[in-house]
């Protein structure tokens, strides 16, 4: 079951206007970005966040989920999303704990390639 666009919009709304949050389509689901860092995924109408030491304080006993078979463990943050201020704090500390995204290399055209 794919994530509904309305659920993705709800998650972004809960993140509030102070954070630079967006979602992007990825593999039929959504990646969740804060300051252009992937902090998690929206899969099957569930919010999965990357586990960080800073984010652990937001979970008493985090439920573990996976965006796809064979993926690393992610925390299921569905309950936290419902509480906007807590969710915003969780997103903020998670993004701060993650490294900056690597710059993309510019695409170069191959000589003789046709458009």
Swiss-Prot record:
Domain of life per record: Bacteria
Pfam families: TfoX_N
The name this protein goes by in its record: Uncharacterized 12.7 kDa protein in trpE 5'region
């Amino acid at each position: 079951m794919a994530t509904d666009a309305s659920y993705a919009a709800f998650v972004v709304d809960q993140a509030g206007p102070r954070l630079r949050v967006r979602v992007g389509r990825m593999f039929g689901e959504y990646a969740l970005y804060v300051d252009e860092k992937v902090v998690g995924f929206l899969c099957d109408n569930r919010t999965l966040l990357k586990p960080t030491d800073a984010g652990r304080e937001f979970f008493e006993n985090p439920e573990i989920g996976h965006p796809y078979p064979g993926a690393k463990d992610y925390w299921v943050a569905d309950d936290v999303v419902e509480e906007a201020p807590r969710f915003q704090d969780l997103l903020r500390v998670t993004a701060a704990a993650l490294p900056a995204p690597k710059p993309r290399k510019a695409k170069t055209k191959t000589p003789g390639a046709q458009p």
